Design a protein with these regions (language model features):
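Hydrophobic hinge/microswitch elements
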Residues: 141-155, 161, 208-263
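Secondary-structure junction motif
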Residues: 161, 199-220, 284-292, 302, ...
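Beta-alpha-beta core module
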Residues: 167-177, 181, 234-283
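A late-sequence structural motif
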Residues: 186, 190-193, 262-311
């Protein structure tokens, strides 16, 4: 008599990518409401997809938690894999689009303010001349968020900055060095060093910049008094020009915007290291490679020299 081996009900189903996208959004955002908003679904639709995914896998993926729901361990396991699956599918779609031809492809870029105002316009202009049909998607965000978008397959290239004391990026992220961007001390007077401003009110930037500022000041023997925080360099320069505080700024930001009344003095040895980051094994898709080449050219065109007039 033949032996019949019980088969779990999950074996009868193929995971639905649309439902995996719902699970991924719920895992990242933490609520049905937020997931529905991101995916442009109604809340009942999100709940339906989660329920169907449970029925198809035979696993409890979510459980009640107060007035809401949260992932179970099984749900978290599948959500982690869902992010990888979605990233691969989106990457495959982007590669196929690029393979059809750069004349009708699309490449997606995420980066931060100072690069958007300096390198990106030059790179996009050059790319447009070489490949006029290639579309560019642009997202304005800080390095940690840009890398998250990159690893989830939502973008093709992330331009990030690092300091010497920044923790290493994940192993599966490939970094392409673009340039080293000097840091400048901003004040509305003649301030030449961090130590000379130990008693000043400081304006801090993003988390990565704030940590580096604290580290630099600690090396000079003081802890800065931070009175304001902003990731917008226009806002930071406005506060400095009004005499409300002092700050540091990368040179690229000063190339993009330099408010009248601000004195910028280069900090010896202080730099942001600027990289274009890609994800996965080489080679990069043609559209991604074309963007990397354009970014390298733009970086070379702004490297060297000072973005500001140095004080006498």
């Amino acid at each position: 008599m033949p032996t019949v081996t019980p088969v779990h009900r999950y074996a009868r189903y193929v995971l639905d990518v649309s439902r995996l996208r719902v699970l991924d959004a719920f895992a990242r955002l933490g609520s049905v409401t937020a997931a529905a908003k991101e995916l442009h679904y109604t809340q009942p639709t999100v709940s339906h997809h989660l329920a169907r995914l449970e029925a198809e896998t035979g696993a409890q993926l979510v459980q009640r938690a107060g007035r809401g729901i949260r992932l179970t361990p099984a749900g978290q396991l599948l959500a982690d894999r869902a992010a990888e699956i979605i990233g691969r599918i989106d990457a495959a779609d982007a590669e196929l689009t690029a393979h059809v031809g750069l004349a009708a492809g699309r490449v997606r870029l995420a980066t931060f303010h100072s690069v958007i105002g300096s390198l990106v316009p030059r790179a996009v202009a050059a790319l447009g001349e070489r490949h006029p049909g290639l579309q560019i998607g642009l997202t304005d965000t800080q390095p940690p968020e840009a890398l998250e978008l990159l690893r989830s397959g939502k973008i093709d290239v992330a331009i990030i900055f690092r300091y010497d004391d920044t923790a290493p990026e994940p192993d599966d992220v490939r970094l392409h060095h673009l340039l080293d961007d000097p840091l400048y001390l901003l004040s509305n007077g003649d301030a030449r060093s961090l130590a000379s401003l130990r008693d000043a009110t400081w304006i801090a930037g993003c988390d990565r910049c704030r940590s580096h500022l604290l580290s630099m000041c600690a090396d000079e023997g003081f802890e800065p008094t931070i009175g304001y925080t902003s990731e917008d360099m226009v806002v930071i320069q406005g506060l400095v020009a009004a005499g409300l505080g002092v700050a540091t700024s990368p040179g690229l930001a000063l190339r993009a915007h330099h408010l009248e009344g601000i004195v910028a003095s280069e900090l010896p040895g202080a730099q942001q290291h600027i990289y274009a980051a890609t994800y996965g094994e080489p080679p990069d898709p043609p559209a991604t490679s074309a963007l990397l080449d354009a970014l390298a050219g733009a970086a070379a065109s702004v490297s060297g020299g000072s973005p500001v007039r140095q004080t006498a």
